Amino acid sequence: MGSSKSKPKDPSQRRRSLEPPDSTHHGGFPASQTPNKTAAPDTHRTPSRSFGTVATEPKLFGGFNTSDTVTSPQRAGALAGGVTTFVALYDYESWIETDLSFKKGERLQIVNNTEGNWWLAHSLTTGQTGYIPSNYVAPSDSIQAEEWYFGKITRRESERLLLNPENPRGTFLVRESETTKGAYCLSVSDFDNAKGLNVKHYKIRKLDSGGFYITSRTQFSSLQQLVAYYSKHADGLCHRLTNVCPTSKPQTQGLAKDAWEIPRESLRLEVKLGQGCFGEVWMGTWNGTTRVAIKTLKPGTMSPEAFLQEAQVMKKLRHEKLVQLYAVVSEEPIYIVIEYMSKGSLLDFLKGEMGKYLRLPQLVDMAAQIASGMAYVERMNYVHRDLRAANILVGENLVCKVADFGLARLIEDNEYTARQGAKFPIKWTAPEAALYGRFTIKSDVWSFGILLTELTTKGRVPYPGMGNGEVLDRVERGYRMPCPPECPESLHDLMCQCWRRDPEERPTFEYLQAQLLPACVLEVAE
């Protein structure tokens, strides 16, 4: 199955400059003004260049590889302290008449921010009014508006971004410290012959007077001054600050404001990407502008009412490692509109031409990305029920995202619901789920262990040479797949932990994610 990024690729990636934003203040406007969408002129478009990100050496295994795993920081939130003037962090092209197009750097007056993730705003540049995605803007003249400020991203996320081989030494970002409330951390890429590419983290401490410092001998009144100073002088850092770390536009929360149940006529199916037992997957466009993937379900696959109810839950699951559900056509044949992932399913990717070139560190990083998405599913008390390589989608730079979460329980086909029917994925299913229908996050953990064998064997069917009935019988009697060729014993041990008979003895996805963390990172004072 295939799927994607919701906007054309070119404007979604850019390398940031160190120049501070314009600090000019602008006045307000009448709050009663009605939306009037007009495309903003192109005079403010910032030149961009493509980039990838890199995943690093896993704890269990050596090396590191390319993999974009981090979305842009979530900067904007509820209006605080009466602040209504915001600055655009990215270009945004509206998709419906009530939305507002804007360019990076535009100042926007917020009219209404009480309607969730889409705010009513007025551009002080173009004079137009309409709805904007709230995660594309930040309060004017705030730390959140600085291009080098990444907010609450984790240490691991910062490492993934900074370990891009395209980044020169000294590429950096500032983030909130994970260990000290109110403090910040400066993360900087470095290189030496012994360690190769690595990341150093420097804690930025705050003075009682409001200033900031890394070392007490050199103090600054603001973070902006600190960054400006260290961009000219290393002064104890591994390297002076050179480039702001590149990142990608965040996903908007849905296709547009109030675009959830959409008319079938608004979708155009263009290229068939795949076909399964229950339907097809197409690359297409929504409203003639937005690249999406469209999953079409055969009539009778599931109840439209049950699907719509489940979809209301699914659309609230938002994580960088889950394929985003954009919209639905709820009448049969049901259409599910999701983000488009350019490389299709992980299973096809592993078995295809690109799979030949994947090495163990890359495969383990893909597993780490999947574990990250499933750790979120775990935290949300949700269950996938059909976790396997065929239901993982791959994008540019080896980005992996979990798809089809929750749909399995809605399927009404007898060959599937019988649990031992021809269409049921016995080889991926935990014994308690296959035999007794006990699907839990722990049965998903079992499936993840099977998925690890798919990764390490480049898409080989699990339990080679065995039929479904034999697999179920032998697994019940204690059989577990042996270590695949060229797979480290440490990784096979992780698989076996996932296949423990007692579901409660299986690890959590949080634990599994931690076991696949990068290790080529040097800590400095965090």
Curated annotation (Swiss-Prot):
Checking PROSITE patterns in the record gives: PROTEIN_KINASE_ATP (PS00107), PROTEIN_KINASE_DOM (PS50011), PROTEIN_KINASE_TYR (PS00109), SH2 (PS50001), SH3 (PS50002)
- The lipid of kind N-myristoyl glycine is covalently joined to G2
Limits of the Protein kinase domain: 267-517
Q: Which InterPro entries match?
A: Kinase-like_dom_sf, Non-receptor_tyrosine_kinases, Prot_kinase_dom, Protein_kinase_ATP_BS, Ser-Thr/Tyr_kinase_cat_dom, SH2, SH2_dom_sf, SH3-like_dom_sf
Looking at the keywords, is Cell cycle present? no
**CDD domains on file:** SH2_Src_Src, SH3_Src
Q: Which family does it belong to?
A: Belongs to the protein kinase superfamily. Tyr protein kinase family. SRC subfamily.
Protein name, please?
Answer: Tyrosine-protein kinase transforming protein Src
Q: Look up and give the organism this protein is from.
A: Rous sarcoma virus subgroup A (strain Schmidt-Ruppin) (RSV-SR-A)
Q: What is the lineage of its organism?
A: Viruses, Riboviria, Pararnavirae, Artverviricota, Revtraviricetes
